[in-house]
Design a protein with these regions (language model features):
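Generic C-terminal helix-cap and adjacent flexible tail
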Residues: 130-135
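Short, acidic/hydrophobic/Gly-rich beta-strand patch recurrent on exposed beta strands
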Residues: 21-24
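A short gly/proline-enriched turn/hairpin at secondary-structure junctions
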Residues: 32-35
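Short, solvent-exposed aromatic-acidic interface loops
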Residues: 26-29, 102
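Unchanged
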Residues: 38-64, 68-127
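Conserved N-terminal beta-strand and adjoining loop/helix that marks the start
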Residues: 1-19
Length: 135
């Protein structure tokens, strides 16, 4: 069984309430969060920061106090762990990476929950919203 690992984050901003950044991936057309494979000697947080910058152009403040892991099998004989952190956007000027991202959207929490394609991502978003409410 081959193991893969990706890291990313739930990127948010506070603008008349909290808004969540969702990206529509070119590969599959699903709505999710910025993430990508860990490269060589990167830490989880370095990977998350790099992927957010690549996919959205945003500089963010990473909050590693929030850390959720999702495990799934993207194809036979492969198990993938995805680590998600929280990341507060420093600016609103997100721009999609044309090679990987079809569209970017800032959405209020309830709309984001409805738009996210996969149940596991919805569960991570719910955990993030609970975390944010306690912070």
């Amino acid at each position: 069984m081959k193991k893969e690992k990706s890291c990313g984050a739930i990127v948010y901003r506070e603008k008349d309430g909290v808004e969540i950044l969702l990206i529509k991936h070119k590969n599959g057309g699903h709505w999710a969060f910025p993430k990508g494979h860990v490269e060589k000697k990167e830490t989880e947080s370095e990977t998350a920061l790099r992927e957010i910058k690549e996919e959205t152009g945003l500089k963010v403040e990473l909050d590693t106090g929030f850390r959720e892991m999702v495990t799934y099998s993207p194809k036979p004989n492969v198990m993938k762990d995805v680590i998600y952190f929280a990341a507060k956007a420093k600016k609103d000027s997100a721009r999609p990476q044309p090679e990987e991202v079809l569209e970017l959207r800032w959405e209020p929490p309830q709309e984001a929950l409805a738009l996210v394609t996969y149940t596991t991502d919805r569960e991570v978003l719910q955990a993030f919203l609970r975390y944010l409410a306690q912070s």
